[in-house]
Regions:
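Terminal-tail/helix-coil boundary detector
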Residues: 17, 22, 247-281, 285, ...
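Conserved, mostly hydrophobic/aromatic
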Residues: 27, 39, 57, 72, ...
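N-terminal binding-site loop/beta-alpha segment at the start of enzyme catalytic domains
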Residues: 6-7, 11-100, 167, 379-388
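Glycine-rich beta-alpha junction loops
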Residues: 106-108, 180, 205-210, 232-240, ...
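Generic structural signal for well-ordered alpha-helices
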Residues: 61, 84, 88, 129-133, ...
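Aromatic-lined glycan-binding groove of carbohydrate-active enzymes
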Residues: 213-254, 289
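Structural preference for beta-strand elements that scaffold enzyme active sites
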Residues: 34-38, 70-71, 99-103, 140-143, ...
Length: 388
């Protein structure tokens, strides 16, 4: 069954029931409806040594579509363009372009020696979007994101160029991935001030093992209309249960980074092993697999619009698609939160009891109807931010 029947008259209640097993959120303040689980395509192709072959990629695509998924994440970089090409072919073969929501990204350079074939300048963005459209076999991209901050290009140039792409009809919505919060804030302010297409999405790493975005990006997203798309919700497979502190052999691609000095791949830490241990206990009590519990936790955190699934086998994607079929009870969620919590960095560590007591004069301040920021409470001479 496809997402939509070619003949509307043939679209029965059974079809609707099947589709509605997946729920959808609007992406940020946009009107774009996306499934809460997105299909990542970085694993489409074996060019990088650990992905899925074409038949497996197609099977994962089909399973995702049959479950009601409509959101596909890709990038020009992924497997040297194979991911975009295969995704475009799979969508076309099933006639799903009108219902599929395609997100792609630019920034990375695939032309050694050509400095303008990468980065976030206007020249590269214009080049990259045309190349992606050609590989995808479509005339528009639903969501086009800056892949990573290049530390050089002004936000004004990026947002003006992305707005031009929207006005040209090549792009519907725009987003940012892997940027500093201050840069995202400036980009959104520029869009609002100048009437450009606003940032509808932030694509960021988030998991029980990586919670840094909670201090700035989550508040930014919820207050300024940018839905968060989560990548690496299983911490590169660490939270799947396949890795242990001491193990023989190669359990997965993360093993290749055991001795890496790159902070993004330093997953084998004492803190993370403690998280894995607690996750395993909670999953056992729920009668669920560790990946499903880890995905459920991420998907139900504040500000999260969608979670990107990155699988290499059909069995993995089928298991992942069941991640939202249950709820994590408050007590078990508290245990996961406690095991994975990290000390607040400055200045958030400064906004504590003594400071708030001086700010509020010992009163309870900020209590508003549901939907507003949590109130700042003062109890006696101490103060804190309500968790309600």
């Amino acid at each position: 069954m496809t997402l939509w029947a070619s003949d509307p008259a043939a679209f029965t209640i059974k079809h609707w029931t099947t589709i509605m097993t997946m729920t959808y959120y609007t992406l940020g303040n946009s009107g774009l409806r996306v499934s809460r689980l997105a299909l990542g395509t970085m694993t489409f192709g074996k060019e990088w040594g650990w992905g899925a072959d074409r038949d497996t990629a197609r099977a994962m695509f089909d399973a995702y579509v049959e479950a009601g998924g409509n959101f596909f994440d890709t990038a020009d970089l992924y497997t040297g363009g194979t991911a975009e090409a295969w995704l475009g072919e799979f969508i076309a073969e099933r006639g799903l372009r009108d219902t599929a929501v395609i997100a792609s990204k630019f920034t990375m350079n695939m032309q050694p020696g050509n400095p303008n074939a990468g980065g976030n300048g206007r020249k590269n963005i214009m080049r990259a979007v045309d190349a992606s459209l050609k590989r995808l076999g479509t005339d528009y991209i639903d969501l086009y994101l800056m892949h990573v901050w290049d530390q050089l290009t002004p936000a004004e140039e990026v947002m003006r160029t992305l707005d031009d792409l929207v006005r040209m009809g090549k792009v519907r919505h725009v987003g940012l991935s892997d940027v500093p919060a201050w840069y995202a804030g400036r980009a959104q302010a520029i869009a609002e001030l100048r009437g450009y297409e606003p940032v509808s999405a932030l694509q960021l790493e988030y998991s029980l093992a990586e919670r840094a975005i909670e201090n700035e990006f989550v508040p930014f997203g919820t207050r300024h209309g940018a839905g968060i798309m989560v990548w690496s919700p299983l911490a590169s497979g660490l939270l799947s249960g396949k890795y242990r502190p001491v193990q023989a052999g190669n359990a997965g691609r993360l093993d290749g980074f055991r001795n890496s000095t790159h902070p993004g791949f330093q997953k084998f830490t004492e803190r993370n092993w403690a998280i894995v241990a607690e996750l395993e206990k909670v999953a056992s009590e729920l009668g669920r697999g560790m990946p499903q519990v880890a995905l459920n936790w991420v998907a139900t955190q504040p500000g999260i619009a969608t979670v990107i699934l990155g699988a290499t086998t059909l069995s993995q994607i089928k298991d992942n698609l069941g991640a939202l079929d249950f709820e994590i009870p408050a007590g078990l969620r508290d245990r996961l939160d406690s095991a994975s919590s990290t000390p607040a960095p400055f200045p958030y560590s400064y906004f504590g009891s003594r400071i708030q007591a001086r700010v509020t004069g010992g009163t309870t301040t900020g209590d508003k109807p549901s939907g507003y920021a949590s109130p700042v409470l003062v109890e006696g001479v101490a103060a804190g931010v309500s968790t309600n």
